[in-house]
Amino acid sequence: MGIDPNYRTNRQVVGEHSGHKVYGPVEPPKVLGIHGTIVGVDFDLCIADGSCINACPVNVFQWYDTPGHPASEKKADPVNEQACIFCMACVNVCPVAAIDVKPP
């Protein structure tokens, strides 16, 4: 089961990180929520294999350290989500379906 495609309406915004919204719940270090609105990454599903970072032609993602998280200790953070060109490359290569892209 991948990211909830309705997280933008089903979850509360609980904060901001690197210029994008974070949707809860969040209970670090084990529950980190979904980061981003245009390009959402479920940090609790992300296994940090780097597929999305390598596939993105406009460098939407940067590595972010998440020590102590059970899935992986780093995440693909959508820090440049405003640059997204909606090619869906990241969505198509993510092995755990942790990414959802929706134009504003």
From Swiss-Prot:
Region (N-terminal extension): 2-37
Gene Ontology molecular-function annotations: 3 iron, 4 sulfur cluster binding; 4 iron, 4 sulfur cluster binding; electron transfer activity; oxidoreductase activity; zinc ion binding
N6-methyllysine modification, residue list: K30
Ligand binding ([3Fe-4S] cluster): C46, C52, C94
Pfam families the record matches: Fer4_10
PROSITE patterns, A to Z: 4FE4S_FER_1, 4FE4S_FER_2
Residues annotated for [4Fe-4S] cluster binding in this entry: C56, C84, C87, C90
Free-text comment on the cofactor: Binds 1 [3Fe-4S] cluster. Binds 1 [4Fe-4S] cluster.
Protein's UniProt name: Zinc-containing ferredoxin-1
Protein's organism: Sulfurisphaera tokodaii (strain DSM 16993 / JCM 10545 / NBRC 100140 / 7)
